[in-house]
From Swiss-Prot:
Membership in a protein family: Belongs to the PRA-CH family.
Biological processes per GO annotation: L-histidine biosynthetic process
Pfam families (UniProt xref): PRA-CH
Compartment annotation: Cytoplasm
Example GO molecular function: zinc ion binding
Cited function: Catalyzes the hydrolysis of the adenine ring of phosphoribosyl-AMP.
Protein name: Phosphoribosyl-AMP cyclohydrolase
Organism: Bradyrhizobium sp. (strain ORS 278)
One GO CC annotation: cytoplasm
Alphabetical UniProt keywords: Amino-acid biosynthesis, Cytoplasm, Histidine biosynthesis, Hydrolase, Magnesium, Metal-binding, Zinc
Enzyme Commission identifier(s): 3.5.4.19
Keyword Magnesium among UniProt keywords: yes
Catalytic activity: 1-(5-phospho-beta-D-ribosyl)-5'-AMP + H2O = 1-(5-phospho-beta-D-ribosyl)-5-[(5-phospho-beta-D-ribosylamino)methylideneamino]imidazole-4-carboxamide
Keyword Glycoprotein: no
Length: 130
C-alpha cells in the first residue's frame, strides 16, 4: 500500500507531534511535500512555517531537535502523526510542549487560561535573539 498524502489547497498536511516515550502532545504544525520528504529521508522532523512561508528543520535555530521514531497517517492521509525523541523543548517559547495552557471552562460560555507544565527549558530571547 502506497503512502499518498492528500495536501490541502495550500499544499500542506497537518502534523501532530508527540513524545515517543511519554505520549505527551508536543506540538501541531504543518508540512508541505518537501518537509515530508526531508523528514522521511533524514529521520529528523521538518516542517513548513505558514507565517514565514519557509521550510524549517526542528532545532536548526534552538538546538532542540526531534528524531522521528515513527510516522503514521490518518485514514484519509490528510494528516500525519510523528512520534519523536524530543531533545530539549518542543515549543519556541522554551517549554517542553506547546500545550502548556489549560482552558478552564467557567460556565456561561466563558473560559480562562491556566498555566500547566509551564517551566521553561531555555530562554527564547537568548536563543532567538528577539
Amino acid at each position: 500500500m502506497a503512502f499518498l498524502p492528500k495536501f490541502d489547497s495550500a499544499g500542506l498536511v497537518t502534523c501532530v507531534t508527540t513524545d515517543a516515550v511519554s505520549g505527551d502532545v508536543l506540538m501541531v504544525a504543518h508540512m508541505n511535500d518537501e518537509a515530508l520528504r526531508k523528514t522521511i529521508a533524514t529521520g529528523e522532523a521538518w516542517y513548513f512555517s505558514r507565517s514565514r512561508n519557509a521550510l524549517w528543520r526542528k532545532g536548526e535555530s534552538s538546538g532542540q531537535t526531534q528524531r522521528v521514531v515513527e510516522m503514521r497517517t490518518d485514514c484519509d492521509q490528510d494528516a500525519v502523526w510523528l512520534r519523536v525523541e524530543q531533545r530539549g523543548a518542543a515549543c519556541h517559547t522554551g517549554r517542553h510542549s506547546c500545550f502548556y495552557r489549560k482552558v478552564e471552562m467557567a460556565g456561561e460560555g466563558g473560559a480562562r487560561l491556566v498555566f500547566v507544565d509551564a517551566d521553561r527549558l531555555f530562554d527564547p530571547a537568548a536563543v532567538y535573539r528577539k
